[in-house]
């Protein structure tokens, strides 16, 4: 067996052994060891060995003490980890049935804006939320302790939308405005405005980072959807098929598809991974302008399996949803067929979001309510939170999930992303967020200039 010691280290070890054997009168063993290790009496005599007499014992005692300290430290570390798990925020409670959790009442109210809040976005790693307002500013909040971290100024008209994205340059915040521009803010450099993207000819109503890449999509009243490279700021692709204001866009979690919708009352699904965007379907059915859209996570597929065509594989944008001024929400399959219509709101549907567990769809409206629709019960409204705001509710977002690092047991925040466009039916339940823990936190913004934060609390007995 080859030694891991250098020749010098091996010689020093042999000298220590000789000194130990000599000091303890083990003459026969000493003679045998000298012969085996090639250390004759004239090379390392008793006088020289005296200098090494206690070296072996000291090293052994030192290593033993170090090992005891290491074991004690590991035990203390385990105790601290158990204490941390017992005191972690309720919204990270592993014992809670997070797939069935629904909001009950706001635990935080963030107030500082001087005009309507038009948009919100959660930071993918930290307990931060960005909000954009008609007061021309973007504000960054710590939603856990309700503190205003900073205010970003730069837009000259109302801020219409914000979104965080994890890019090769780090985490960026994108904002768009009625001033026709898009701004990129570097979150790692005090939110410095690093780029301003110009190319739209009218109000830019929505921005969304495309997962698994350095792309940003934007939608505008100029009837265009533009894809941008956020590293160099160049326009990559332009979609010009809409015949009215494009109000909202939503990418699939694998970055292969983009959903767009707006005032022309159409829903369009684009394959944006192609060299030129390919329209997979154009659907109609709403009776008024469409204000919002969302792509369902793969975790929703099993709850809507009876509505989907049976085939060997599916795409990441198998199910999509839209909300309209006609007060309804519609769900669509990947062919543009309406598979479900949800009615119950008394006014415009402003924003929608799928529960990460896939079972529910949440919506907010100008009727000041948040509604929760159970997709496993034909879209029945199972919960309605009245007067969630003191005015129209304009936006709704669910916090990104937490990816567990199984190598060391630590938790890190992760976007929902997947590399393949074609997904085997047997893998659908795994694809939504593989290895990702759902966080029971969501937020809404309204014309009352407030952000409401909803989260699972320790005393929540009922999830619905």
Curated annotation (Swiss-Prot):
Its main location: cytoplasm. GO terms for biological process: cell division; endoplasmic reticulum to Golgi vesicle-mediated transport; establishment of mitotic spindle orientation; intra-Golgi vesicle-mediated transport; intracellular protein transport; microtubule sliding; retrograde vesicle-mediated transport, Golgi to endoplasmic reticulum. This is Nuclear distribution protein nudF 2. It is found in: Cytoplasm, Cytoskeleton; Cytoplasm, Cytoskeleton, Spindle pole. CDD domains: WD40 (cd00200). InterPro entries: Coatomer_complex_subunit, Dynein_regulator_LIS1, G-protein_beta_WD-40_rep, LIS1_N, LisH, PAC1-like_LisH-like_dom, WD40/YVTN_repeat-like_dom_sf, WD40_repeat_CS. Belongs to the WD repeat LIS1/nudF family. Residues 63-88 form a coiled coil. Gene3D superfamilies: 1.20.960.30, YVTN repeat-like/Quinoprotein amine dehydrogenase. It comes from Penicillium rubens (strain ATCC 28089 / DSM 1075 / NRRL 1951 / Wisconsin 54-1255). Dimerization mediated by the LisH domain may be required to activate dynein. One of its GO terms (cellular component) is microtubule associated complex. GO terms for molecular function: dynein complex binding. The gene is nudF-2.
């Amino acid at each position: 067996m080859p030694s891991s010691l250098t020749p010098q280290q091996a010689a020093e070890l042999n000298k220590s052994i000789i000194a130990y054997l000599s000091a303890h009168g083990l003459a026969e063993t000493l003679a045998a060891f000298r012969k085996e290790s090639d250390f004759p009496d004239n090379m390392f005599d008793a006088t020289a060995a005296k200098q090494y007499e206690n070296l072996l014992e000291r090293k052994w005692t030192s290593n033993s003490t170090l090992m005891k300290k290491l074991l004690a430290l590991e035990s203390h570390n385990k105790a601290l980890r158990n204490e941390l798990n017992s005191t972690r925020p309720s919204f990270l409670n592993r014992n809670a049935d997070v797939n069935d959790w629904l909001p009950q009442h706001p635990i935080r109210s963030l107030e500082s804006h001087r005009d309507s809040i038009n948009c919100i976005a959660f930071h993918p790693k930290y307990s931060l939320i960005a909000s954009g307002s008609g007061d021309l500013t973007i504000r960054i909040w710590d939603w856990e302790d309700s503190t205003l971290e900073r205010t970003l100024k730069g837009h000259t008209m109302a801020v219409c939308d914000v979104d965080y994205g994890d890019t090769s340059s780090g985490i960026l915040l994108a904002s768009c405005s009625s001033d026709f521009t898009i701004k990129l803010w570097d979150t790692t450099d005090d939110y410095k405005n690093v780029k301003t993207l110009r190319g739209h000819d009218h109000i830019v109503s929505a921005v969304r980072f495309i997962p698994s890449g350095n792309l940003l999509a934007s939608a505008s009243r100029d009837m265009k959807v533009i894809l941008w490279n956020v590293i160099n700021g160049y326009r990559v692709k332009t979609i010009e098929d809409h015949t009215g204001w494009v109000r909202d866009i939503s990418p699939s979690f694998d970055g292969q598809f983009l959903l767009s919708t707006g005032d022309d009352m159409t829903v369009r699904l684009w394959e944006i991974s192609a060299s030129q965007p390919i329209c997979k379907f154009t659907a109609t059915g709403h009776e008024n302008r469409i204000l919002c859209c969302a792509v369902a996570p793969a975790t929703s597929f099993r709850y809507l399996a009876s509505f989907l065509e049976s085939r060997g594989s599916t795409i990441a944008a198998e199910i999509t949803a839209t909300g309209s001024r006609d007060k309804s929400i519609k769900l669509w399959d990947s062919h543009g067929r309406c598979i479900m219509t949800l009615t119950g709101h008394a006014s415009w549907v402003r924003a929608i979001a799928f529960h990460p567990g896939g079972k529910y769809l949440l919506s907010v409206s100008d009727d000041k309510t948040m509604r929760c629709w159970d997709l496993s019960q034909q879209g029945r409204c199972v919960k309605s939170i009245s007067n969630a705001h003191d005015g129209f509710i304009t936006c709704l977002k669910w916090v990104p999930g937490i990816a567990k690092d199984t190598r060391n047991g630590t938790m890190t925040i992760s976007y929902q992303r997947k590399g393949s466009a074609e997904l085997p039916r047997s893998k659908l339940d795994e694809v939504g967020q593989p290895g990702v823990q759902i966080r029971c936190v969501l937020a809404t913004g309204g014309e009352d200039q407030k952000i409401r934060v909803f989260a699972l609390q320790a005393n929540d007995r009922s999830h619905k």
